[in-house]
């Protein structure tokens, strides 16, 4: 299935929507309109990007956006020639892969989120066009924009270990490695249930532990172990991991924004000195129990926040 993406102005989007009939209700978050035309799905996103999906995507895009279609083809050719780094096509991007990654493990506030995502060879060009990259190189705004598009066409499973459950498991002796192993394994299994596994070439996990450690903590067998690989700095080696990273980071960012609204103060990410100060303010204004409900209790920030309050 071909996928073609364009970035259009508001004027061009209005023109496009006047050419065929679009649905504008009951759409996924981040999507403005959707249409089915000549066996091709046309999605218009709030970001101004338009995606054509289907075996006739190229022909339909040329019919509906003749000028833009030609420009996009020329730009793609120039970009591929001029920027060989974009075409690193590290092994995994030549195959159909499930990638998995997590967010929030190094942050005092907020949950631990894990995502597994299935990316096919056919997805690779569109993901590069959308600007999918290592999430560490992307702003929160860009991550939200990308994730709201990715979840509409990438088979995935997103799991969230909220702070209350996280703290209970940690008190039972669960390390973060164990939590992540269990969540990654579960998310991967969930994705396998959504796809034809005969089409899968590899499962690529952004490595946070060696295979034997992961296997020990996962609580259940690794599905398709012969196809499973562990990669350090996986986001830069596999677009499947990059997609999983963006979606898991999106879930974490969204939750952090909600926490900030609930307590009427901006909650910082990470585990630095700014976090200690905000944690102390939360204790003072809402109590230690409220702090514990939105944070990872075993981090040193909790103790440091209490020390900040002692002189007061």
Curated annotation (Swiss-Prot):
Keyword annotations: Cytoplasm, Endonuclease, Hydrolase, Magnesium, Metal-binding, Nuclease
Annotated cofactor note: Manganese or magnesium. Binds 1 divalent metal ion per monomer in the absence of substrate. May bind a second metal ion after substrate binding.
Gene3D superfamilies named in the record: Ribonuclease H-like superfamily/Ribonuclease H, TATA-Binding Protein
Ranges annotated as spanning the membrane: none
Substrates-to-products reaction catalysed: Endonucleolytic cleavage to 5'-phosphomonoester
One Pfam assignment: RNase_HII
Broad enzyme group: hydrolase
Listed EC numbers: 3.1.26.4
InterPro entries: RNase_HII/HIII (IPR001352), RNase_HII/HIII_dom (IPR024567), RNase_HIII (IPR004641), RNase_HIII_N (IPR024568), RNaseH-like_sf (IPR012337), RNaseH_sf (IPR036397), TBP_dom_sf (IPR012295)
Cellular component annotations (GO), alphabetically ordered: cytoplasm; ribonuclease H2 complex
Span of domain RNase H type-2: 95-311
Positions bound to a divalent metal cation: 101-102, 206
GO biological process per UniProt: DNA replication, removal of RNA primer; mismatch repair
Main location, first listed in the record: cytoplasm
Cofactors that this protein relies on: Mn(2+); Mg(2+)
GO molecular function, one term: RNA binding
Cellular compartment(s): Cytoplasm
Family the UniProt entry places it in: Belongs to the RNase HII family. RnhC subfamily.
Function: Endonuclease that specifically degrades the RNA of RNA-DNA hybrids.
Name of this chain's protein: Ribonuclease HIII
Source species of the chain: Staphylococcus aureus (strain MRSA252)
């Amino acid at each position: 299935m071909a996928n073609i993406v364009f970035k259009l102005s508001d004027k061009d989007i209005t023109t496009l929507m006047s050419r065929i009939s679009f649905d504008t209700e009951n759409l996924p978050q981040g999507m403005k309109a959707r249409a089915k035309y000549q066996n091709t799905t046309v999605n218009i996103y709030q970001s101004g990007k338009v995606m054509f999906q289907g075996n006739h995507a190229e022909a339909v895009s040329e019919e509906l956006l003749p000028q833009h279609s030609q420009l996009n083809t020329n730009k793609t050719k120039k970009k591929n020639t001029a920027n060989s780094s974009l075409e690193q096509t590290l092994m995994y991007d030549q195959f159909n892969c499930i990638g998995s990654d997590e967010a929030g493990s190094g942050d005092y506030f907020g949950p631990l989120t894990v995502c597994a995502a299935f990316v096919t060879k056919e997805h690779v060009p569109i993901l590069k066009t959308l600007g999918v990259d290592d999430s560490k190189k992307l702003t929160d705004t860009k991550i939200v924009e990308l994730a709201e598009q990715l979840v509409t066409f990438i088979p995935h499973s997103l799991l969230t270990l909220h702070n209350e459950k996280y703290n209970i498991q940690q008190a039972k002796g669960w390390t973060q490695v164990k939590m992540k192993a269990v969540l990654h394994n579960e998310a991967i299994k969930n994705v396998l249930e959504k796809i034809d596994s005969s089409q899968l070439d590899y499962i690529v996990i952004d490595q946070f532990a060696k295979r034997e450690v992961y296997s020990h903590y996962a609580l259940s067998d690794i599905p398709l172990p012969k196809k499973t690989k562990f990669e350090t700095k996986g986001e830069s080696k596999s677009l499947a991991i990059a997609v999983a990273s963006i979606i898991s980071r999106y879930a974490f960012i969204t939750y952090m924004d909600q926490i900030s609204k609930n307590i009427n103060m901006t909650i910082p990410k990470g585990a630095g000195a700014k976090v200690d100060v905000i944690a102390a303010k939360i204790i003072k204004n809402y109590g230690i129990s409220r702090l514990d409900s939105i944070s990872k209790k075993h981090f040193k920030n909790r103790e440091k926040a209490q020390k900040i309050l002692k002189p007061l």
